[in-house]
Amino acid sequence: IIEPNSSIKGLFDENMDIIFANQSLYYIPLKELKQNILEFYELLNTGGILFATMMSKKNYYFSHSQKEEKNGLSKVEINGRLNETSFIHFIDKAEDLENLFQPFETLFLGDYDPINFYNFEGSAHHYIYIGIKK
């Protein structure tokens, strides 16, 4: 079992060709997130790919967030259909991912915002980062 905000070092006996981190990394405090990114780099074979998504400030969660704390997370409180309290690391623009995901070499920066015909709360915008271990 992985403890919250813990190292993943030593969990795997073999290296990998791809790491897929979809809608999960933005809950990790910045210091630990950077540590995990370095561990991802170590876990990948040369030529291995990291696919990751991060929540953007265009996402409706940001409009419910408080000031960013020293650990890089902002408290988010949502009431209504979604009733939750989260702590999220928001990304301002896609280019910010290049610095965050160093030492990976960037292959692709993009974004997505799932279509929601009913638009319950607002945008679900996320940024996409794809990088390679050289």
Regions found by a protein language model. Give the residues of each.
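A short glycine-rich, Lys/Arg-flanked "PGG" loop and its adjoining helix->strand segment in the class I
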Residues: 34-46
